[in-house]
């Protein structure tokens, strides 16, 4: 995490890290590790606490006081009061600052126009909201009037520089000069497949791969010269009809996998490789048909939270080694696989998951490659071998 933050600071003048859930909500909901606060600690990032103050009066003071009491590193440098009227803000601001010795940087009044609806896996994506640009412009106008942007910039400028020790990688990376032709990994990226850790894609490039994006929704074939396939998470269930109608791409992907092309499919990408996706009403939509099984919307949360995946056989990792990831899905499959063992933090609870063979990795978990770079290394090497003609025929894994 420190390494990624340091690398980003070389490119961007300012970084904004958006927290998720509550500030102190970490592993299992009981540990600091993995929380937004923990992230701020390891990256030495000052915190601006945004408090939902709707319907609150003076009670907002002990609420803020509680967060400050937990702030052992004194990282909280200011507070913004969300969904509060201007008239009450002018009353409560001096009281907060006098009692808690914390700067109140401003407020944002509630406006229906600024609300963004959520759904089962979170917020709607920017490209799906017709008036998103106007919403952002209105929000910026409001914030300029009611929040001290200058003070926020000053707080950001006070952040400490992250010093990173140079560590020799245990896994030797492939450089472009070592390859006559670099393997090309085709990455699905459109409205239906949009959940990717950018760090994962950067790591694939570091290990010698080129990346080419394509759309299972709109394109008819994979990028020319593809020797690996990455199908990330997203919302294929929302575009099931369109994916079904793109018969050419479904056949293209099935043929690619059957030819032995290495494939990594996470969550939404895993759903797409099934024979069919069934919606909440049980209606089936035909998918790529690589995996002879159907997946169904269960109408309830099936898995959620951080996990570590332990390798049972040496395909994408060495036996017994682990890689970190997370799960968040309402769908379930007739064939979830059992080639890896998922281990939950805190409780240590385990369960089998993932379908994994020599050149196939697919399942519900979203992986974070930097937690074990060997995964990216293996993936790129498999793509290189495919490019060299190693995988000449498809073996039925299922």
Task: Label each region the model flagged.
Residues 1-8, 12:
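Single conserved hydrophobic/aromatic residue that forms the stacking wall/gate
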Residues 14-27:
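Switch II (G3) loop of P-loop NTPases
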Residues 30-37, 65, 245-249:
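Charged helix-capping and loop-helix junction motifs
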Residues 32-53:
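Inter-motif core of Ras-like GTPase G domains
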Residues 40, 179-180, 193-205, 210, ...:
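C-terminal and late-domain segments of enzyme folds
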Residues 57-173:
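Internal gly/pro-rich beta-alpha loop/helix module
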Residues 183-247, 251-256:
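Phosphate-binding active sites in nucleotide-utilizing proteins
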Residues 236-315:
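Cysteine-nucleophile active-site neighborhood
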């Amino acid at each position: 995490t420190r390494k990624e933050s340091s690398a980003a600071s070389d490119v961007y003048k300012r970084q904004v890290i958006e927290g998720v859930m509550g500030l102190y909500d970490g592993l299992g909901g009981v540990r600091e590790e993995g929380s937004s606060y923990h992230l701020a600690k390891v990256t030495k990032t000052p915190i601006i606490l945004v408090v939902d103050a709707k319907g609150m009066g003076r009670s907002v003071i002990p609420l803020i006081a509680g967060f400050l009491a937990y702030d052992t590193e004194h990282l909280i440098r200011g507070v913004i009061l969300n969904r509060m009227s201007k008239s009450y803000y002018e009353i409560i601001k001096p009281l907060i600052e006098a009692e808690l010795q914390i700067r109140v940087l401003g407020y944002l009044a509630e406006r229906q126009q600024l609300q963004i609806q959520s759904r089962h896996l979170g917020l709607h994506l920017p490209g799906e909201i017709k008036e998103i640009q106007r919403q952002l412009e209105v929000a910026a106008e409001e914030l300029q009037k009611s929040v001290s942007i200058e003070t926020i910039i000053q707080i950001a400028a006070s952040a400490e520089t992250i010093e990173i020790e140079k560590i020799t990688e245990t896994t030797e990376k492939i450089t472009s000069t070592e390859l006559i032709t670099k393997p090309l990994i085709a990455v699905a990226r459109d409205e239906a497949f949009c959940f990717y850790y950018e760090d994962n894609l950067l790591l694939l490039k570091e290990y010698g791969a080129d990346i080419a994006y394509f759309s299972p929704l709109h394109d008819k074939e994979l990028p020319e010269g593809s020797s690996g396939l990455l199908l990330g998470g997203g919302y294929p269930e929302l575009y099931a009809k369109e994916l079904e109608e793109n018969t050419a791409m479904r056949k293209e992907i099935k043929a690619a996998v059957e030819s032995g092309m290495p494939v990594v499919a996470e969550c939404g990408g895993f759903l797409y490789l099934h024979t069919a996706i069934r919606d909440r009403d049980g209606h089936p939509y035909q998918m790529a048909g690589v995996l002879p099984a159907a997946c169904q919307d269960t109408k309830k949360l099936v898995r959620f939270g951080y996990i570590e995946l332990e390798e049972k056989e040496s395909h994408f990792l060495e036996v017994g080694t682990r890689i970190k990831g997370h799960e968040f899905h309402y769908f379930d499959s007739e064939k979830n696989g059992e080639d890896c063992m998922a281990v939950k933090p805190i409780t240590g609870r385990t369960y089998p998951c993932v379908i994994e063979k020599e050149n196939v990795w697919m399942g519900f978990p979203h992986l974070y490659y930097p937690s074990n770079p060997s995964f990216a290394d293996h993936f790129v090497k498999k793509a290189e071998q495919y490019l060299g003609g190693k995988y000449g025929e498809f073996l039925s894994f299922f």
